[in-house]
Amino acid sequence: MAAKKNSKSQPATGDNRQKALDAALAMIEKDFGKGAVMRLGDDNRPPISAISSGNTAIDVALGIGGFPKGRIVEVYGPESSGKTTVALHAIAQAQRAGGIAAFIDAEHALDPDYARKLGVDTDALLVSQPDTGEQALEIADMLVRSGAIDIIVIDSVAALTPKAEIEGEMGDSHVGLQARLMSQALRKMTGALYNSGTTAIFINQLREKIGVMFGSPETTTGGKALKFYASVRCDVRRIQTLKDGQDAIGNRTRLKVVKNKVSPPFKIAEFDIMYGEGISRESSIIDLGVDNGIIKKSGSWFTYDGDQLGQGKEKVRLYLKQTPELADEIEEKIFRALQIGKYANQNDALTDDPVDMVPNIDFDDEDNG
């Protein structure tokens, strides 16, 4: 009987290894196109670019000056914590830079008047109010694959109701439907987002797990897929009510970057959300300017470059709002001092110890997976 042919590949040796690799690469390039496989050192792509959040503190916490382009971002937190406000500010910044934005309003709760106050060009904003979760994610996928969208916001994951649940009876069990829907959609969208350079912001809600004895009982809706596919996850919480006398005028809000694949994680940003006005960029510029020695504070007086800005933080905030050129100048100095965005040193960023850079870390809140 003839010997059975051995179908196992034999390891190449010596010069044959390079020849075998070159032949395989040539075949892959022929079948799948140029660039299907490349050496990492030959990749001449620029550093990850970002869409500004519109707030200096958030841009600093994200590490690259904003939300990364071509990636998935999850913004979650309790009700009325400022999640949609953060996303709308990012849309406004993308539009100011000449980009096109889309908003998938699964909650059917978008307020156009409030969006306009935050700087969103509502006439140019693409809005969809889908009937089902499948329809919402299919529309989002088609917009991303067009290659024309710079940022797309899905508000919210919890409202992406599967078609079977909508058509079913009240009380019917639909275990895992939404999780499977999200998992399939994210598998499809991830590559398209990277190729088109579109930033996708998924707004999510919190739920509580029953029977948890240790650790946080809080979890997000939609299964685990979004946790894995997201390059950045932001936990947004309201920590204080801002008052003018007895009247509430806004909220002090904390954003914690609990996962970050493009910069060291666990950084925290605190900022003010003023009612009817949105996130106060000027307030964050004052806070970071003082922290980094760019703005000098003596008692209640604030001084910049030898000139007095005013007495009291609120007066200085209003002054910076009336002089945006000065606010831009101070913000640029903050980014330069902290090496954020275009001022980042890419080589140093890979060797920095994130624990040394971020005070008061609570590793029990979230993992970085």
Swiss-Prot record:
Disulfide bonds: none annotated. One of its GO terms (biological process) is SOS response. InterPro entries: AAA+_ATPase (IPR003593), DNA_recomb/repair_RecA (IPR013765), DNA_recomb/repair_RecA_CS (IPR020584), P-loop_NTPase (IPR027417), RecA-like_C (IPR049261), RecA-like_N (IPR049428), RecA_ATP-bd (IPR020588), RecA_C_sf (IPR023400). PROSITE patterns: RECA_1, RECA_2, RECA_3. Coiled coil: none annotated. The keyword tRNA-binding does not apply. It is found in: Cytoplasm. One of its GO terms (cellular component) is cytosol. The keyword ATP-binding applies. Pfam families: RecA, RecA_C. Keywords: ATP-binding, Cytoplasm, DNA damage, DNA recombination, DNA repair, DNA-binding, Nucleotide-binding, SOS response. ATP binds at residues 77-84. Its main location: cytoplasm. Can catalyze the hydrolysis of ATP in the presence of single-stranded DNA, the ATP-dependent uptake of single-stranded DNA by duplex DNA, and the ATP-dependent hybridization of homologous single-stranded DNAs. It interacts with LexA causing its activation and leading to its autocatalytic cleavage. Belongs to the RecA family. PANTHER family: MITOCHONDRIAL DNA REPAIR PROTEIN RECA HOMOLOG-RELATED (PTHR45900:SF1), RECA (PTHR45900). This is Protein RecA. The lineage of its organism: Bacteria, Bacillati, Actinomycetota, Actinomycetes, Mycobacteriales. The gene is recA.
